[in-house]
Amino acid sequence: MAGIYIHIPFCKRRCIYCDFFSTTQSEKKSAYIHALCQELDMRKDYLEGEDIETIYLGGGTPSQLTQKELEEIFSSLYNIYKVKENAEITLEANPDDLTPEYIHMLRTLPINRISMGIQTFQEETLKLLHRRHTAQQAIEAVKHCREAGFQNISIDLMYGLPGETLETWKEDLQQAIALHPEHISAYHLIYEEGTALWKLREQNQVEEADEDLSVTLFKTLIEELTHAGYEHYEISNFCLPGLHSRHNSSYWTGKKYLGCGPSAHSFNGTSRQWNVASLDKYIQSIQQGELDYEIEELDIYTRYNDFVITTIRTHWGMSLSHLRSIYGENLYQYCLRMAKPHLEQGVLEIKEDTLKLTKEGIFISDGIISDLLFV
């Protein structure tokens, strides 16, 4: 089983915190879609004929695509790859794009999961972040998706936002819970160098949330969502029982995936590769029958580190027998040795051959993971 990620880089405007590759050159959509479909064909052997269990259209803003453009992509996917009948197929969307008419169109396509970038329900903060939607548009978009028959809806939230308090965060969480999405992702705001948000902080126009507040917000996130019946299955992800993101979970469990489009990453079990982060260079290289990318062959230590980073973040934890059989006795013993002080402190535990974070360990997961890495 494997997954496919499709990068749709087009945005009407750029959010001030975003450092993903995106562009506002919507006039190049047609040329891009054509190049993307060519890449899907050029790389049809990358996954060695494995069935496709998940497809994820991310961005950028995939909901900027028209019916014709989406149909072209899905036609290529289904003609070239063996997509399973029960595949999870996700489209990332901005709430203001999700009009009843657009949602009705999406229902005619193989898409069965909507991932909506809401971020917050605070109007002034939405404006500061350069989000295009209002809180009411976000609420209505979820309701319209539900009315149209979508039974798997995910929403993204952010915390640690400028001006945020515990009270406004609780308001956001209560509003999110009231919408009853199947899945909620919640990420702490990161001030990425080079973004407009970074520059605002450097100019003292916004203030970063302090560590104590950030911990309180994260703790409140866990308490509110678990109380509402959501499973905390990965550091930043929550779902109703059985409705975890199958696509993202495939990353965390080390499955192969193909990434197509500018800046997209791929993994085949032994190497990582990533496409050029330029729309023009990407299209030009495809037109010349080539692909502009870089590749990194992964030695056993790098693969071990990736295994640690991805598995420890989940509630499934790390299978010690899998660690031993795949990475050998030396790395198995190394991991146990590095885990010992954390086991003694009660922030890691071993249950039924699985090494995992305890509830206390979740709050210091980055430090624990860092200690387990082979350096």
PLM features: residue spans?
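Short, amphipathic alpha-helical interaction segments positioned at domain boundaries
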Residues: 362-375
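A short, conserved structural fragment
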Residues: 343-353
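Immediate flanking context of iron-sulfur cluster ligation sites
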Residues: 1-8
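Local cysteine-cluster metal-coordination motifs and their immediate loop/turn environment
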Residues: 9-20
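Minor-groove-contacting beta-hairpin "wing" of winged helix-turn-helix DNA-binding domains
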Residues: 354-358
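C-terminal scaffold of the Radical SAM
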Residues: 1, 22-45, 50-329
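Short amphipathic alpha-helical interaction segments
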Residues: 329-343
